[in-house]
C-alpha cells in the first residue's frame, strides 16, 4: 500500500508506476510512503 500526502503526490506516484518505476523509487520521487499496514499513519490515502 502506498500513502501519499496529497493528490499531486498520488498522481506522480501513479504515473511513475505506470511508466515502469519500482514502488520504492516512485514513492521517493512523489513524497509517498510504502507501508504494509492497511491504513496510512500520518495522512489519509487519497
Curated annotation (Swiss-Prot):
<dbReference type="GO" id="GO:0005576">
    <property type="term" value="C:extracellular region"/>
</dbReference>
<keyword id="KW-0611">Plant defense</keyword>
<dbReference type="GO" id="GO:0006952">
    <property type="term" value="P:defense response"/>
</dbReference>
<keyword id="KW-0964">Secreted</keyword>
<dbReference type="Pfam" id="PF00321">
    <property type="entry name" value="Thionin"/>
</dbReference>
<keyword id="KW-0800">Toxin</keyword>
<feature type="disulfide bond">
    <location>
        <begin position="4"/>
        <end position="32"/>
    </location>
</feature>
<dbReference type="GO" id="GO:0090729">
    <property type="term" value="F:toxin activity"/>
</dbReference>
<comment type="similarity">
    <text>Belongs to the plant thionin (TC 1.C.44) family.</text>
</comment>
<feature type="disulfide bond">
    <location>
        <begin position="16"/>
        <end position="26"/>
    </location>
</feature>
<keyword id="KW-1015">Disulfide bond</keyword>
<protein>
    <recommendedName>
        <fullName>Viscotoxin-A2</fullName>
    </recommendedName>
</protein>
<comment type="function">
    <text>Thionins are small plant proteins which are toxic to animal cells. They seem to exert their toxic effect at the level of the cell membrane. Their precise function is not known.</text>
</comment>
<feature type="disulfide bond">
    <location>
        <begin position="3"/>
        <end position="40"/>
    </location>
</feature>
<dbReference type="InterPro" id="IPR001010">
    <property type="entry name" value="Thionin"/>
</dbReference>
<dbReference type="InterPro" id="IPR036391">
    <property type="entry name" value="Thionin-like_sf"/>
</dbReference>
